Amino acid sequence: MKIKSFIGGFDKNISYLIWCESTRRAGIVDAAVDISEIIEFIESKNLILEKLFITHSHFDHIKYIEDLRDQFPQLQLCGYYLPEEDFGVNHRGLTHHEIIPIGTEILTVLHTPGHYPDSICLWNKKDNCVFTGDTMFVGRTGRTIGAKSNISHLYNSIYETLLILPPQTIIYSGHHYGFKKSISL
């Protein structure tokens, strides 16, 4: 799986463009940054954007959904809990351990509540990487902010879901808070 990061948004947010090199099928992890650079890159690589994954529904991770939908009307929106009244048509609610293809690449959905009830991570076993949203950052765990956050759920998500992945798994988090954008578990 190929990965390209784009930094911007409100607080060093990161959106990731992921794609299958053999089929050119692509997805975006979080609609967190202005889409102009992403579109330019998609066009330069002749990629076919199919899916937009939302790691959780905090505004800084969903701000550019409509901009992406305007450019890519067929785009399927994928997240743990996506009510039609909030996200409109062509959305897909994901479940824990669900397998999602991007071309020949496979992502496994990991429900990781705590930072927010609908938080998910996306694990690519073959390339040993995980997109963690705000559940885990480089050098530290995510945090609990607001009434819907739950420290016990976050603890369980970290210790019972993420830290059981192979230790060489590379973390791609939702913000660039660390000394580098990604790091192994």
What is each of the regions a protein language model found here?
Residues H97-I99, I106-C121, R140:
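Pocket-forming structural segment of enzyme catalytic cores
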Residues L52-I62, L110-S119, Y172-G178:
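Histidine-centered catalytic micro-motifs
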Residues K12, T23-A26, V33-T108:
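Active-site HxH/HxHxD metal-binding segment of metal-dependent hydrolases
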Residues M1-K45, C121-G133:
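Conserved beta-strand hairpin/beta-sheet module of binuclear metal-dependent hydrolase folds
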Residues F6-I7, H91, H111-P113:
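Short Gly/Pro-enriched turn/cap motifs at secondary-structure boundaries
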Residues Y116-L185:
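Metallo-beta-lactamase
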Residues F6, I18, H96-I102, H175:
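Short acidic-hydrophobic surface loop/beta-edge motif
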